[in-house]
């Protein structure tokens, strides 16, 4: 048996810990500053990157002032210029908000147009991407830009071109994409460090409790109510 996904996961975990520690710390500082100044987290990922976006929004152990930006087409139109700009008409942002945009290639117009809009609102932007792969990709947007170029902080998921990482005898292509796994590690560590920073500053961070434990729903609802006009805005 060759390299398995468990092997690759261990390898990636060590690589991310070694190479992304400082970037994670910088991202965590931005998140902490946003939350302590009444901002909210907004996260977007098209296609499979949506799985990473919901890692930081509305889940147990995450920060309550957060919302996922829904892609109504599930990624089918991410390569069509203008679709991202249309999506921004449904969004709202305040200067203290912080955004996560997750895209493995960072080349599609949808993410690029969202990034342009986010920066125009004066908000901080954290991009999760495969940096090496993105830097060698051709942009699909007429501006020629790639998503990472808009970032205040880049979290590099260290995925390979095409995402799939493992080879099997008898198979021409590769299997097992790694970007989702890497994104979860990067994002959860960022939230952990952000919460730690807030506590160090004497600020009690609003963290979700599981709705499936007694009292969790009531606890969450009481805090969500303070942010309802922001986190439930469609």
Curated annotation (Swiss-Prot):
Q: Which biological process annotations from GO are given for this protein?
A: carbohydrate derivative metabolic process
Alphabetical list of CDD domains matching this protein:
SIS_RpiR
- Coiled-coil-forming residues are none
What SUPFAM superfamilies would the database entry show? Answer: SIS domain
Which intervals hold domain SIS? 31-205
Q: Name one GO molecular function term.
A: carbohydrate derivative binding
The family line of this record is: Belongs to the UPF0309 family.
Its name, as the record gives it, is: UPF0309 protein lin0024
């Amino acid at each position: 048996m060759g390299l398995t996904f468990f092997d690759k996961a261990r390898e990636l975990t060590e690589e991310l810990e070694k190479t992304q520690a400082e970037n994670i710390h910088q991202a965590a500082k931005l998140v902490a500053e946003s939350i302590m100044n009444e901002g909210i987290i907004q996260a977007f990922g098209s296609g499979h990157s949506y799985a990473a976006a919901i890692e930081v929004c509305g889940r147990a152990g995450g920060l309550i002032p957060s919302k996922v930006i829904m892609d109504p087409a599930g990624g089918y139109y991410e390569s069509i210029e203008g679709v991202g700009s249309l999506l921004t008409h449904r969004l709202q942002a305040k200067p203290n908000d912080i955004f996560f945009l997750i895209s493995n290639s960072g080349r599609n117009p949808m993410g690029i147009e969202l990034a342009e809009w986010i920066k125009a609102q004066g908000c901080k932007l954290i991009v999760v991407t495969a940096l090496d792969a993105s830097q060698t990709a051709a942009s699909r947007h007429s501006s020629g830009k790639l998503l990472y170029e808009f970032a205040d902080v880049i979290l590099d998921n260290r995925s390979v071109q095409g995402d799939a990482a493992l080879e099997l005898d008898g198979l021409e292509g590769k299997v097992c994409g790694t970007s989702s796994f890497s994104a979860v590690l990067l994002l959860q560590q960022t939230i952990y460090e952000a919460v730690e920073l807030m506590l160090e500053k004497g600020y009690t961070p609003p963290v979700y409790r599981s709705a499936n434990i007694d009292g969790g729903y009531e606890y969450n609802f009481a805090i969500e109510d303070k942010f309802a006009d922001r986190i439930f805005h469609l």
